[in-house]
């Protein structure tokens, strides 16, 4: 396998608060990377930085043949990025599909319309072609019978599966998941994780921010434990989750696994 995603010395601050201090890691094509850590540790900011939804202060992100050195991304006098930089960020975003914590579906569009929005509007794909593929993707996530329903007519788990289909519609190199089950009722979590497990089995490259330790143990090729904007510990789940070496990782997992 070859390295598909490379992150080098990523840093990001919001005012005086440094969320990411110095993050570096790599992910090989066809593998699943799970990111765990306490609230406020920088997990979501890291994920959003990979497709430039957040612009890091410095650091380099490479996905496939697209590399962005964020130290060179500098707004012009009116706060607008130069055209070449906007195009570079757009090229990076095109390499990934994002599945959000709270679905982020367009409420006035059907499930199918949500799925084909990106390919048609952003990528210029013909509506007929995008529709055929959109229906295939909804079938892929078990929602072929719900293509014409609006988000308010779907359960939270169904909405999240529409979100997964939408992320896949752009044919991304890597799929980014930001706590995809944290907003769901417990009985709906299994359906979403089932889709994610099948995607992993099919060889999709996935980077997943999650608190689902069992999923990480079963599916992840590597786990990153992040705290204080740093990668404190990384490795296969058999090491990081089952046999953590760093005291911060041990303390976090102990709290997470404590009986209620």
Each model region followed by its residue ranges:
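C-terminal boundary and immediately downstream tail of ABC-type ATPase nucleotide-binding domains
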Residues: 228, 238-260
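ABC family nucleotide-binding domain
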Residues: 3-237
